């Protein structure tokens, strides 16, 4: 929105030309995202406490989690509002990719909100029935997938980029729709599974978003895209503003979510944030890099799949508890140690993912 205003004012006041620079808007997106979250946070927390919207703790979980019962949840609302407002302020709203990401934010945020509402307010421990949750996730993801496939104007928008191999970029064709669906829904649920400790999900989300901010900038810059042998996608650079909004809003949320947490993000936050990372990876054609940089999310998801599969097939559990962060808690690791070590792993994986852009 401010881009339009600045373009109108620039002929009269040249100072406003700075708003047209992507890097300036990306930095401002971080700052406003952070500012919105810090402003919304205390007000939202007080409101959640007033309405007695508190976390329900599993009886079979680690004993250290019993003290978390009643902590305000659905704090993801502050993250999504902060991202949305920052994007509306600083992104070029004429860019279709901006609206695709905002659609994902709103649709998956709504699914998560309904799930939290049923759990916390309606006192239904199962929340939104699993099949209906996956149905609406699938519906939203498929709408996006079909839209992107139908509106693709260049081959670069539907190729599969394979890390380490600069000459292997097969055209996906209709498989693009299927892959987009799995990436969005998979990422959404992976972040949701990771959100089990104070700050555990949000900081890896911030780090991965930072990595994709750089990738989006390079993908939308024809010179850097050619230099790195990655597809040039004309509209992709604007995604940098969205990624930096995630960084700012995420850090603002972490201010209240750090151990011991004053608020939890709930499904309204985790489902939406995962889906946003998924759609950004699709738009910049770096789905495999999401798999690498979001390795902690993958590890958490695989631990659940392996645990359930092993129990059904052999009647035995592999881990003391899944997702795997609970396994380490039950081994005696203090919660902050689990959190920080998972953060360190994510930092290493994000750097590794960025390095793969050059090692081709």
UniProtKB/Swiss-Prot annotation:
One Pfam family cited in the UniProt record for this chain? MraY_sig1
Its biological purpose is as follows: Catalyzes the initial step of the lipid cycle reactions in the biosynthesis of the cell wall peptidoglycan: transfers peptidoglycan precursor phospho-MurNAc-pentapeptide from UDP-MurNAc-pentapeptide onto the lipid carrier undecaprenyl phosphate, yielding undecaprenyl-pyrophosphoryl-MurNAc-pentapeptide, known as lipid I.
Membrane topology (UniProt) = Multi-pass membrane protein
Q: Can you say what this protein is called? A: Phospho-N-acetylmuramoyl-pentapeptide-transferase
Question: GO CC annotations?
Answer: plasma membrane
Q: Where in the cell is it found?
A: Cell inner membrane
GO MF, any single term: metal ion binding
Instruction: Assign the protein's first listed, main location to one coarse class.
Output: membrane
The disulfide bridges present are: none
Q: Name one GO biological process term.
A: cell division
* Broadest EC class assigned to this enzyme: transferase
Q: Which residues cross the membrane?
A: 21-41, 71-91, 94-114, 142-162, 168-188, 199-219, 236-256, 263-283, 288-308, 338-358
Cofactor(s), names only, from the UniProt record:
Mg(2+)
Looking at the keywords, is Cell inner membrane present?
A: yes
Q: Which reaction does it catalyse?
A: UDP-N-acetyl-alpha-D-muramoyl-L-alanyl-gamma-D-glutamyl-meso-2,6-diaminopimeloyl-D-alanyl-D-alanine + di-trans,octa-cis-undecaprenyl phosphate = di-trans,octa-cis-undecaprenyl diphospho-N-acetyl-alpha-D-muramoyl-L-alanyl-D-glutamyl-meso-2,6-diaminopimeloyl-D-alanyl-D-alanine + UMP
Q: Which organism's genome codes for this protein?
A: Tolumonas auensis (strain DSM 9187 / NBRC 110442 / TA 4)
In the record, the note on similarity to other proteins reads: Belongs to the glycosyltransferase 4 family. MraY subfamily.
Key words of the record: Cell cycle, Cell division, Cell inner membrane, Cell membrane, Cell shape, Cell wall biogenesis/degradation, Magnesium, Membrane, Metal-binding, Peptidoglycan synthesis, Transferase, Transmembrane, Transmembrane helix
Q: What is its EC number?
A: 2.7.8.13
Q: Which domain of life does this protein belong to?
A: Bacteria
Annotated InterPro entries: Glycosyl_transferase_4, PNAcMuramoyl-5peptid_Trfase, PNAcMuramoyl-5peptid_Trfase_CS
Per the record, the pathway is: Cell wall biogenesis; peptidoglycan biosynthesis
């Amino acid at each position: 929105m401010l881009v339009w205003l600045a373009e109108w004012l620039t002929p009269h006041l040249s100072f406003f030309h700075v708003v047209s620079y992507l890097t300036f808007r990306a930095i401002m997106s971080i700052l406003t995202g952070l500012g919105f979250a810090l402003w919304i946070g205390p007000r939202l927390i007080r409101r959640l406490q007033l309405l007695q919207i508190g976390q329900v703790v599993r009886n079979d979980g680690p004993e250290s989690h019993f003290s978390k019962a009643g902590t305000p949840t659905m704090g993801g609302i502050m993250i999504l509002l902060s991202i949305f407002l920052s994007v509306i302020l600083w992104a070029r709203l004429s860019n279709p990719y901006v609206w695709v990401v905002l659609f994902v934010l709103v649709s998956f945020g709504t699914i998560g909100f309904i799930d939290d509402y049923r759990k916390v307010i309606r006192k239904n421990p199962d929340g939104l029935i699993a099949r209906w949750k996956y149905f609406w996730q699938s519906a939203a993801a498929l709408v996006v997938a079909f839209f992107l496939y139908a509106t693709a104007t260049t081959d670069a928008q539907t190729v599969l980029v394979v890390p380490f191999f600069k000459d292997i970029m097969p055209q996906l064709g209709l498989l693009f729709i299927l892959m987009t669906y799995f990436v969005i829904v998979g990422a959404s649920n992976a972040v949701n599974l990771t959100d089990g400790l104070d700050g555990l999900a949000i900081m890896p989300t911030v780090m991965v978003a930072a990595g994709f901010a750089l990738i989006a900038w390079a993908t939308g810059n024809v010179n850097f895209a050619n230099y790195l042998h990655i597809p040039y996608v004309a509209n992709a650079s604007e995604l940098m503003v969205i990624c930096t909004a995630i960084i700012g809003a995420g850090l603002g949320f972490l201010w209240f979510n750090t151990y011991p947490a004053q608020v939890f993000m709930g499904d309204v936050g985790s489902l939406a944030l995962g889906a946003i990372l998924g759609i950004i990876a699709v738009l910049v054609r770096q789905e495999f890099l999401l798999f690498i940089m979001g390795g902690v999310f993958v590890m958490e998801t695989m631990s659940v799949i392996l645990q359930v599969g092993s129990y059904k097939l052999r009647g035995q559990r592999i881990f003391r508890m899944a997702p795997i962060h609970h396994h380490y808690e039950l081994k005696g690791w203090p919660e902050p140690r689990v959190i920080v070590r998972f953060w360190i792993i994510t930092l290493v994986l994000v750097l590794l993912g960025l390095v793969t852009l050059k090692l081709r």
